[in-house]
Each structure stands twice: as C-alpha cells, then as structure tokens.
From Swiss-Prot:
Biological process annotations from GO: ATP synthesis coupled electron transport; photosynthesis, light reaction
Subunit structure: NDH is composed of at least 16 different subunits, 5 of which are encoded in the nucleus.
A GO MF label: NADH dehydrogenase (ubiquinone) activity
Topological relation to the membrane, as annotated: Multi-pass membrane protein
Organism: Ipomoea purpurea (Common morning glory)
Top-level taxon in the UniProt lineage: Eukaryota
Record's protein name: NAD(P)H-quinone oxidoreductase subunit 2 A, chloroplastic
C-alpha cells in the first residue's frame, strides 16, 4: 500500500515539474526567441551532418549563416520593448543586453564566411567547427542577459569550453596544442576565482543570487560596506579580467592568438570581449553599487596597465597575430574607460560605439591576415614587404583597418576614440584620457611602420613570399567579410550621430 502511495506522489511531483517547465517555455520562451533560433540551427546542423555526405557541406555554411541572420532579425524586431525578467529571475531582456547580443551575433556572422576557405584549405572538420562557433555564440548571448550568479557562471563556461576546443582545432600543430593547454589551465583557474568571489557576495547578502536582490540583501544585512565586499570585488575582478584580458591578466592572449587557427583568433578576439564587457558592466554597476569608488580605482589601474603595456610591447612583435594580440590588450584599456564613466556621462554609449567600430576594424585586419596566410603560408610582419606591388586591394584594405585601429581621421576608429575620450574627460578622468591619447600615438607608430612596409617595399626588400604571391579569383568569402569590415571601418565615421543615438538608448 505504501509503495502505491509513494508511486502516486512521485507521479504527481513529476507532473508538477513538467508543467512548470512547460509553463516557463511557453510564456518565457518568447523572450529568448533569438537564442532558440540558434539552438534550432545547431540541431539542424547535427541532423544534416549525420544523414548526408561531403557534397552537402555548402548547406552547413548556409544553415549556420541563416540561423545567425534570423537571430539578428528577431533581436531587431524586439528592440525598444519593455525590460523583462524571465525564467524565475535567471535572465533579463532589455535594450542594453540586446545591443551586446547584436554585436556578438554580428561577429559570428562575419567570422563564418571568413573561415570557409581556410577550413577547406586546411581540411579541418567543418561541422564541429560550426557547432563550436554557434554554441559559443549562444553562450555569449546568454551571458549578456544573465541576471543571477548561476547563469553568469554557466554561460561563460559554455563559451569558454567551445573556445578551448576551437583554439586547439588544428590538433597536429604543436603551437595550437600549447596554446590550448595554457588557455584551458588559466581559464579553469579564473573560473574558480570568479566563483569564490560570488560565494562571498552570496554569504554577505544573506543567500541571494539575483543581481538586484543581492543589493537589497546587502542593505538588509548592513554588509554593503564590510571588508568582505572588497574581498569579493578583488576576486570577481580577477575572474572577469581573464575574459577581458587586460594587463596583468593578459599572459594567455599572445600565445593563444599565435597558436590558434587565424579565423578562430578573429572570432575570439571580439566575441569574448563583447560578452565579458556586458557582464562586467552589470556586475560592477549593480551588486557593487555601494563600492563604486573601489571598483573605479581597480579598473583605472587595469586600464592604465593595459594601454601602456599592450601598446609598448606591440612595437617589438614580429608576428602579425601577436602584434594584434598586444594591440587588443591596449584596446580593452580604452573600453574600460567607458565602463568606469558609466551611464551618467554617456560612458556606456561611448563604450558600445567604440566596440562596434572595433569589431569591424579588428575582423577586417584578421580577414587580411587570413587571406595573406593562405596565399603565402607566413605570418611574419617582414614578409608583408612590398605587398602593394602584388595585391593593391589587400594591401589597401589592411592599411585602412590598421589606420582605423590607430585612430587616424576621418576613419571610424578616430571618431570612436574621440567620443570615448570626450566622455572620459567630461567625467573627470583626465589622467586616463591623457594616457589613452599618449598610447594611441604609440599605436599609430607601429601601425604606420607596417603600412610603410606594405607600400614601399623595394625590389631587393621584397621577400620570396610576396615575390611568388599569386592572387586567387576574387569570389571567395574571405574577401566578402573583408570588404564589409573595411567599409564599416571607414564610412561610419562620417555619420556618427545615428550610431550614438542608438547607443544612448541602451539603458538598464
């Protein structure tokens, strides 16, 4: 008799759980419709790969790109809707989160055509590559909208695991294996440190895990000014620092950039920073609301170290990928200025605007590197000497992207930095802005040094790689991504106002 009662109770409990899950999916699922499109695309990829032969490979690219474009479309249709919290407080949708999700989707959409020819030439497995890219994109999107500590931990782990696998995708390359091992070990350590910081906030707030509820809990327990908050702040800053890769948390960046496949580096160099910036902004601004002076000081130190070390060490590099790795460390220092300024002086708007331009500039430069590497098999900066004589289009495209990264007018990078530095100046961050201007001049030096090499290499200085350079027909997908990124790195500088207006509309 007791067995029947237990069995009935088990069935009733299971039914309640199922109905609750169904209710969440039915009423809250519409709030993650862009993410659901990506999940459907992932399932479709697996089904086609398991039921078709190699001749169906173009369909894999088409499905991946289509799911990303459809997800962007769904996101744009949802723009300006009222902020909503769903899935029992795990996820929040608002304009601020959605614009970062849009940036991540944009990165992935541009990276897939950039990878097609590279994958075919290196004979890598295409299905797994696309699965990892889409899953990492999904993790980044969930991280942008994460509203509690569990989601903030699980979402970046989803992104990070795919990143580790992508960085070691060329298994026979010793450098790739080394890069993956360093990336994995440091990623695991940083995740542990991040969770330890979360545990401090969880205890101090009286057992709360939602971001806004943590603030209320700290007020109720009167612990918002306790030393434990400072300890939690340090641990969380170190954990997030690995994702953003500012100095001194940058040690993994150059090795991973150099050892990983170039399309993977292009993908990781932008998506990881976009997702981490969105998460860092919400974590610092909400749970650490009462410790703004402390986290401002911490981020100011990180920004100064990043801008100085990143740009100075980039001067000495001989590899294009390592140079862009150190350049990205300097670039994240500029982005941190926007995080420090906050919403009061358009800091977030300037950060988002600059991030949009950074995506086009960085992906454009990496598209040029992928194309040059496929045609010559080298990554050395000196081997680019005299490229203009063989391929003026590629040389000019790379030059424009590098000049935009350096912040020369009238390119998009100049206006992005100008807006960012102006907001920092208005907020009273005079020293940070001065360091930013000074290091921007340093970055222009090493970018111009490469451009001079591209344009003015004499016959005796031209390397065998460029001398034997053969330009392939201009119908490959890499050039498509490159053209889009080059245009986006130049034209938006002329029409900044609409972009700034959209960025200013991204409030919490």
């Amino acid at each position: 008799m007791s067995w029947h009662v237990q069995n009935e109770n088990f069935i009733l409990d299971s039914t309640r759980i199922f109905m609750k899950a169904f209710h969440l999916l039915l009423f809250d699922g519409s709030l993650i419709f862009p993410e659901c499109i990506l999940i459907f695309g992932l399932i479709l990829l697996l089904m086609i790969d398991s039921t078709s032969d190699q001749k169906e490979r173009p369909w894999l690219y088409f499905i991946s790109s289509t799911s990303l474009v459809m997800s962007i479309t769904a996101l744009l249709f949802r723009w300006r809707e009222e902020p909503m919290i769903s899935f029992s407080g795990n996820f929040q949708t608002n304009n601020f989160n959605e614009i970062f999700q849009f940036l991540i989707l944009l990165c992935s959409t541009l990276c897939i055509p950039l990878s097609v020819e590279y994958i075919e030439c290196t004979e890598m497995a295409i299905t797994e590559f696309l699965l990892f890219v889409l899953t990492a994109t999904l993790g980044g999107m969930f991280l942008c909208g994460a509203n509690d500590f569990i989601t903030i931990f699980v979402a970046p782990e989803c992104f990070s695991l795919c990143s580790y696998l992508l960085s070691g995708y060329t298994k026979k390359d010793v450098r790739s294996n080394e890069a993956t091992m360093k990336y994995l070990l440091m990623g695991g350590a940083s995740s542990s440190i991040l969770v330890h910081g979360f545990s401090w906030l969880y205890g101090l707030s009286g057992g709360e895990i939602e971001l806004q509820e943590i603030v209320n809990g700290l007020i109720n327990t009167q612990m918002y000014n306790s030393p434990g908050i400072s300890i939690a702040l340090i641990f969380i800053t170190v954990g997030i620092g690995f994702k953003l890769s500012p100095a001194p948390s940058h040690q993994w960046t150059p090795d991973v950039y150099e050892g990983s496949p170039t399309p993977v580096v292009a993908f990781l160099s932008v998506t990881s920073k976009v997702a981490a910036s969105a998460s860092a902004t919400r974590i610092f601004d909400i749970p650490f609301y009462f410790s703004s002076n402390e986290w401002h000081l911490l981020l100011e130190i990180l920004a100064i170290l990043s801008m100085i070390l990143g740009n100075l060490i980039a001067i000495t590099q001989t590899s294009m990928k390592r140079m862009l790795a150190y350049s990205s460390i300097g670039q994240i220092g500029y982005v941190i200025i926007g995080i420090i300024v906050g919403d009061s002086n358009d800091g977030y708007a300037s950060m988002i605007t600059y991030m949009l331009f950074y995506i086009s500039m960085n992906l454009g430069a990496f598209a040029c590197i992928v194309l040059f590497g496929l045609r010559t098999g080298t990554d050395n900066i000196r081997d680019y000497a005299g490229l203009y004589t063989k391929d003026p289009f590629l040389a000019l495209s790379l030059a424009l992207c590098l000049l935009s990264l350096g912040g020369l007018p009238p390119l998009a990078g100049f206006f992005g930095k100008l807006y960012l530095f102006w907001c920092g100046w208005q907020a009273g961050l005079y020293f940070l802005v001065f360091i930013g201007l000074l290091t921007s001049v340093v970055s222009i030096y090493y970018y111009l040094k490469i451009i001079k090499l591209l344009m003015t290499g004499r016959n005796q200085a031209i390397t065998p790689h460029v001398r034997n350079y053969r330009r392939s027909p201009s119908n490959n997908s890499i050039e498509l991504s490159m053209i889009v990124c080059v245009i986006a790195s130049t034209i938006p500088g002329i029409s900044m106002n609409p972009i700034i207006a959209i960025a200013q509309d991204t409030l919490f």
